[in-house]
Structures are given as C-alpha cells and as structure tokens.
Amino acid sequence: RISVLKEVIAKVYKTRLPNLHIYISQKDVNEYLSCLSRETKRFLYPQATILYVDPYDFGTVHIPTLRTFCEKFYCELLFNLFTSDWVRNRNNELDSRIDKVIDNPKVKINNKTELVDYMLKQLKVGRMQYSFNYEFHTETNVELYQIMYLTPKDTGLEKLKDALWDTFKGA
C-alpha cells in the first residue's frame, strides 16, 4: 500500500494541483482524528475531505471520535468495519475493546446486522446523507469485513458504483 501511495502522491505533486492538499500521519487513528477535528480552517466547508480509515482490527477506532470528525467536516468516509472481529469476540468477557469502541453502555448489539446498522447511524451525521456497504468474504464465504462508504452527495455513490464495476468486472 505504501508504494502505491507514494506513486500516487508523486504524480499528484508533479501536476501541482493548487487545490489539492494531502495530509498524512502515522499517529494512532484516534489521536489522528482528534488532531484533525481541532483544525478550524483546513477542513471546513467548502473544503472536501476523503477520509479513509483502515484500522488494525475492530477494537482500534473509537466511533465517537470518528463521528465527531464526520459531523464537523464536509467529507466522504471509507471505513473498514471488521465484522469478523466483532463476531469472533462479541461474547468474550475479556475483550472490552468492543465496549470501548462503541462507548455507550446503553447500547446492546446482538448480531452483525445490528452492528452495521448502529455504525451507519453513528456515522451518518453532519452532511452525510448516503451510504453503501460492501462485504468482503473468504474463499469459503465467511465475511471478513465490510467497507462502509458514506457521502454527502449522491454523485459519490455513482462514482463508487462505477469504480466497483470497473474493479470487479461487473461480478
């Protein structure tokens, strides 16, 4: 991934687009989002941000922190939701990461569908109006994760549909 990103960034900087700024950090995702949320000018409307959150596992991203960013800024969000981690660890009393991620003791999630619905409800805030989930499975058809895409504009969904169609050759 890093080599692909470096290649893309090199091409972007070579063309010198004055209205495109790339912000990269190697901080913990929650620290990173908190830092970005404190920015007052760089990410406010009419600036458009594409936020790609690909955590190490389900317990990594604090959803209220991600929600705050989505509420405050005009952005599109690509979020990797590790549903397999949740399914595997939901009944594990020792794994408090799930509770920490959700950060709401009143919320009880009983199955994967409720988890996805809860996440969408939490992230469809601010200008976010449209969403799309795409499940990724193993060769034995076990779901590993879902890519959640949220956007303020329906044209974002159209572009995503076209990209998925091109990538997966209509399959």
Mark where each language-model region is.
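SAM cofactor-binding core of SAM-dependent methyltransferases
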Residues: R1-C35
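Short catalytic-loop micro-motif centered on adjacent basic/acidic residues
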Residues: I22-Y23, I50-D54
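Class I S-adenosyl-L-methionine
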Residues: L33, T40-T49, Y56-A171
